[in-house]
Amino acid sequence: AGRPEFVVHSPGRVNLIGEHVDYNGGLVLPMAIDRGTAIAARRRDDRKVVMWAEAVAQQDAFDLDRTGRVNKCDWCNYVRGVAALLARAGVDVPGADVVIAGDLPIGGGLSSSASLEVGSGYALLALAGAEMDRLRLAQLCQQAEHQFAGVPCGLMDQYAVVFGRAGQAIRMDCRTLAHQLVPCDHEAIAWVVLDSKAPRKLGASGYARRRKECDKALAIIRKAGHDVTSLGEVTLETLLACEDRLGETLTRRVRHVVTEIGRVVEGSDYLSIGRYDLFGRLMYASHR
């Protein structure tokens, strides 16, 4: 009973080009989509947050003074993490009743988790009468996923949700955390995202293993005397010089990062001039 004080809509995102590049300090090209997460919230008189998630028909409740992780409830941990880190950042987060709904397929690769995190952040900030810089909120939501969900994600997903604009892709530099908006809306084309129905969880998809392999490759390249702080700074020449040290698997990982960054640069230029045919070829190359 009763009406919400605030309703927040937080979009999902799709990454056009730039897979496995965000945590390697490279360039990525995501865009926000028209599906997302809706969060209705109102203040309570106590220190509890009571949540209902429509998509999974689950309830969760926690005390703001003792916010911890729970087992076997991913969505609960995303919201718990955001609430805890907002409080740690000095926001006076109030008790709240929260209802979560949306039309993003969970585990479909459209950043349902980042959408939920960012939406929760904005809803709790609104209830607290507080504001936060968009980049800072994106970083806080990323940390919530690291600390409460145990997923070592890069920043791209939260960043794309926070900075996304209709009809624009985001060319994001994951090293400097700056971005440019790239027009990608044209009456002659439509972006179609198909749900394969194959569930995907970052925590169990080999994502963490691949991230460790990239970290290992960077350590080897640095040990060989190359002054780089991320794989995003590695050139093709540097990769060729280190192939023997890296071995086949790590060489493949680094080559993907180097060539993928090139595709983001080229692809954003193609989008800017409306050459969707050439952009499409780069998408095929990216997914090989």
Question: For each of these PLM feature ranges, what is it?
Answer:
Residues G2-R13, A38-K72, Q168-R288:
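C-terminal nucleotide
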Residues D22, A160-V161, A198, R263:
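Hydrophobic side chains within alpha-helical segments
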Residues A1-A114, V118-R134, Q139-Q143, F148, ...:
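ATP-binding N-lobe of GHMP and related small-molecule kinases
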